[in-house]
Amino acid sequence: VLRKMIRFTAFISFPLMFGMALVANELILITVTEKWAPCVPILQLLCVWGAFSPICELYKNIVISHGKSNIYLYANVIFGILQILLLIMMLPYGILWMVAAYVLAYLCWLLVWHCFASHLIGVRLYHVIRDILPYFLITLSVLSCAWWVSFFSGNIYIRFALKIIVSAILYIGIMWGVKSVIFKECIGFLWKR
């Protein structure tokens, strides 16, 4: 069940969050104007965090559902202390480096949560990587194509729309073409409603 939930999470969160990272520049410029342009890399880093955050939450829920609230508490306290140390160390370098350090630490800490879940239910890292890698690679390929198609447009609104439309069409088309089980189940669920 966990592996299916991880696949579903990757199927949804990777295109949405990495897609937001792709349109971050246009989104910031359109919504809050040029003066906020330095925030674009911060938003992109937070999108990377957001792509993997739901997977981490699944691991945390495994720990809690097995009655290991002590592990949950200790892991969160240790990570909180690590965040404070990173904040202090990165303070002289500015907020961008603070966010980058946080995202990197979070991704590394995801492995800690995986170790706890693996100990409790026997899920292997190899299987998790095998489950999420296709969605990750398809998402990166789709977004690369969308970036390339939109690259030649000088109009920010057209570029923004092209990135979203091309990404959505390609992602759905590829999922349909490779006969993704998760995709078919989602479509089936939506049609039943």
Named regions from a protein language model:
Residues 1-77:
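Specific pore-lining/lateral-gate transmembrane helices of multi-pass inner-membrane transport
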Residues 3-12, 79, 126, 130, ...:
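Alpha-helical transmembrane segments of multi-pass membrane proteins
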Residues 8-17, 76-80, 96-118, 164-168:
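Short alpha-helical transmembrane segments in multi-pass integral membrane proteins
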Residues 23-28, 32-36, 67-68, 90-95, ...:
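Short helix-capping/hinge motifs at transmembrane helix termini and TM-loop junctions
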Residues 38-42, 94, 98, 127, ...:
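Residue-level signature of transmembrane alpha-helical entry/exit and packing/kink sites
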Residues 59-88, 96-99, 131-132:
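Alpha-helical transmembrane segments of multi-pass membrane transporters/permeases
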Residues 84-88, 139-154:
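Hydrophobic alpha-helical transmembrane segments in multi-pass integral membrane proteins
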Residues 118-125, 132, 147-193:
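Membrane-proximal transmembrane or re-entrant/amphipathic helices at the cytosolic face
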